A protein has these predicted regions:
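A ligand-binding cleft/hinge motif common to bilobed small-molecule-binding domains
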Residues: 46-53, 100-107, 132-168
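Periplasmic-binding protein-like
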Residues: 63-70, 151-191, 208-220
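Extracytoplasmic small-molecule ligand-binding "clamshell" domains
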Residues: 1-45, 205
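Extended ligand-binding regions for polar small-molecule ligands
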Residues: 6-15, 74, 82-83, 87-88, ...
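Bilobed "Venus flytrap"/periplasmic-binding protein-like clamshell domains
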Residues: 2-14, 46, 67-123, 143-145
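Short helix-initiation/N-cap motifs at beta->coil->alpha
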Residues: 21-32, 76, 116-129
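Ligand-binding clefts/hinges and TM-proximal coupling segments of bilobed small-molecule sensing domains
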Residues: 96-115, 159, 190-220
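Alpha-to-beta junction loops
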Residues: 17-19, 36-44, 87-88, 116, ...
Length: 220
């Protein structure tokens, strides 16, 4: 696995003197597996929300940014809700991105604009195949995924970004089961990495320096 999430997870494990075992999983299974104790912690661009804090503990490590990605030859720009009206938009089911887009869609329909045509797929590869084939106009996902894909593939571009909290700033965090006792050591490790510069090196490697946080806190 490659990306900012496994890189951060590895640094945290190294700082705590733990051996990291990375396991890829679906978005839905991630939460169930943390609930059951199969996974100790989730690092998967998880947005901190008040609802999630009822069941989980969080140690933040990035500002949450959502990206709108289109084909390289597309003239679409996304700056406000009306820019997605009537578009075919691919987004992950049950994600924070979806919740923001659903609110935008309600707002657009109330203004008499055409509804968004939402499309859902099983994995990221399917989303990008749909985008490249023209079955969708826009893919909406985590900024790190979009930034990496657009840079490596050369076939797409980012045409808009918004906070993962919608109208308010949101945080990305490592997620543990509520009361497990792991979240404070994780936050302490992240703060050590922020101090020694290794955290900044990882974000710079993935072109995400603008998503840095000055400190990690528990349940921000």
């Amino acid at each position: 696995m490659i990306g900012v999430e496994p890189d951060i997870a590895q640094l945290v494990a190294d700082t705590l003197g733990l051996k990291l075992r990375l396991e890829p999983t679906s978005w839905e299974n991630l939460f169930r597996s943390v609930d059951s104790g199969q996974y100790d912690i989730g690092f998967s661009n998880i947005t901190v929300t008040e609802e999630r804090k009822d069941k989980y503990d969080f140690a933040n490590y990035r500002v949450d940014t959502i990206a709108f990605e289109v084909r390289k030859d597309s003239a679409i720009q996304v700056r406000q809700p009306k820019d997605i009206a009537g578009r075919k938009v691919a987004v992950g089911s049950g994600t924070n991105q979806e919740q923001i887009l659903l609110r935008w869609d309600v707002q657009n329909k109330a203004a008499g604009l055409p509804p968004v045509q939402f499309q859902y797929y099983t994995n990221t590869a399917d989303y990008y195949l749909a985008l490249q084939s023209g079955r969708v106009d826009i893919y909406v996902g985590p900024n790190p995924t979009a930034a990496y894909h657009s840079a490596v593939s050369g076939d797409t571009k980012i045409v808009g970004q918004v906070s993962g909290g919608g109208e308010i700033a949101a945080q990305i965090a490592g997620m543990t089961k509520k009361g497990s006792g792991l979240v404070q050591p994780v936050a302490d490790a992240l703060n050590e990495l922020i101090k020694n510069g290794k955290y900044a090196e990882v974000l710079a490697r993935w072109n995400l320096a603008n998503e840095a946080v000055p400190a990690s806190v528990v349940n921000p």
